[in-house]
Amino acid sequence: MRIIGIDPGLARVGYGIIDEIEGKKIMIDCGIIETKSTQKEEERLVEISNDLSSIIKKWNPNSAAVEKFFFYRSSTTISVVQARGVIMMTLGKYKLPIQEFPPMQIKLAVTGYGHSDKNDVLNSVMHELNVTSPPKPDDAADALAIALTGIYLK
């Protein structure tokens, strides 16, 4: 099984690719899709879709896991929701089964405690994937946690 985890955003979209082979989880790749604040919003959304398409074509995941939000209050959050919609559309274009998880469920799945802090999540991700240095930037590490949640809760 190969899964892509995605941490949605407009400025930075984190992604993480993990293989699960006979119960062992192996980090294949992680990183970010970054857009510039000087671009028009529609240009940023197109860039996210195009870059995500390239990542999907390169790594050919079997499924996807995406962070899900419940509250939309600020204009910044609305932009993130728009980016998330583009991400969902792009995943759908490749017919990837999509799992969606709220932040508390991701923390619970990865650390065993739904109110864990970022360091606890990061340490759990590093331990599970047997990596010695933290995945950078934080958005990529978060995406790996989302991918692990997709594996644990499949």
Curated annotation (Swiss-Prot):
Principal place of residence: cytoplasm
Alphabetical keyword list: Cytoplasm, DNA damage, DNA recombination, DNA repair, DNA-binding, Endonuclease, Hydrolase, Magnesium, Metal-binding, Nuclease
Co-factor binding comment: Binds 2 Mg(2+) ion per subunit.
Superkingdom assignment: Bacteria
Cofactor names: Mg(2+)
Listed GO MF terms: crossover junction DNA endonuclease activity; DNA binding; magnesium ion binding
GO biological process, one term: DNA recombination
EC class (word): hydrolase
Keyword Ligase: no
Entry's EC annotation: 3.1.21.10
A Pfam family recorded for this sequence: RuvC
Assembly description: Homodimer which binds Holliday junction (HJ) DNA. The HJ becomes 2-fold symmetrical on binding to RuvC with unstacked arms; it has a different conformation from HJ DNA in complex with RuvA. In the full resolvosome a probable DNA-RuvA(4)-RuvB(12)-RuvC(2) complex forms which resolves the HJ.
Protein's recorded name: Crossover junction endodeoxyribonuclease RuvC
Gene that this sequence comes from: ruvC
